[in-house]
């Protein structure tokens, strides 16, 4: 890539650490703050209503209501991400943008989860969400390989009664895997976003990645 010669050698490691720290901090202290940006109980109630409707009506439209709710939340989060990414790009803030970006990503996935009746409080649920984000960031052959493995895991979870109880989960290890996937994919955009004059070019890609992750979350 033509940008390679301009990018500091330590930037990849710095991004890895920034993403890992961002996720760890949000899981420790930030989930409650994120939940203030939407009505969790209302979303749970909507899921119950949609579930009842799908059982009674048993038609395609009632089933689509789950996806409709998830897409509505996704659209809002894309707007938030656009403002956040471009706004900080204008002032050349690439690395400082990462905790905010991570928060928007988690907010989007949380709302998708609630739309389908899932929560995100346990370590098992957090690891699953992190895996969704990780796999969504891969391209081509790597994506196919990781997606197939993830689908196999999901099939096993469903076979076990839709629970991850008893699974060996390592939240810290998954945080690091997700951080590496994000930093590898976003290396060039975060470099651009950190430049005062052309930062907006990097910031434009934040909503692109949020959409990519949200779309993948809807599928899972």
Where on the chain are the PLM-derived regions?
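Transmembrane alpha-helix interface/packing and boundary motifs in multi-pass membrane proteins
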Residues: 84-96
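Structural signature of FAD isoalloxazine-binding scaffolds in flavoprotein oxidoreductases
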Residues: 104-108
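Terminal, membrane-proximal amphipathic helices
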Residues: 1-83, 110-220
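Hydrophobic alpha-helical membrane segments of integral membrane proteins
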Residues: 97-102
């Amino acid at each position: 890539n033509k940008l390679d010669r301009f990018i500091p050698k330590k930037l990849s490691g710095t991004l890895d650490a920034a993403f890992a720290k961002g996720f760890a901090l949000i899981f420790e202290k930030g989930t409650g703050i994120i939940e203030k940006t939407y009505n969790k109980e209302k979303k749970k109630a909507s899921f119950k209503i949609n579930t009842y409707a799908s059982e009674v009506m048993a038609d395609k439209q009632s089933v689509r209501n789950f996806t409709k709710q998830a897409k509505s939340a996704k659209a809002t989060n894309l707007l938030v991400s656009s403002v956040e990414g471009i706004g900080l790009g204008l002032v050349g803030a690439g690395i400082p943008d990462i905790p905010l970006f991570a928060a928007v990503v988690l907010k989007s996935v949380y709302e998708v989860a609630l739309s389908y009746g899932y929560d995100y409080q346990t370590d098992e649920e957090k690891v699953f969400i992190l895996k969704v984000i990780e796999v969504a960031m891969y391209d081509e052959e790597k994506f196919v390989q990781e997606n197939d493995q993830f689908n196999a895991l999901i099939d096993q979870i469903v076979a076990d009664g839709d629970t991850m109880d008893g699974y060996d989960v390592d939240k810290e290890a998954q945080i690091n895997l997700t951080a590496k996937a994000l930093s590898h994919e976003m290396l060039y955009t975060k470099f651009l976003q950190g430049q005062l004059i052309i930062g907006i070019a990097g910031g434009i890609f934040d909503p692109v990645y949020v959409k990519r992750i949200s779309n993948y979350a809807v599928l899972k």
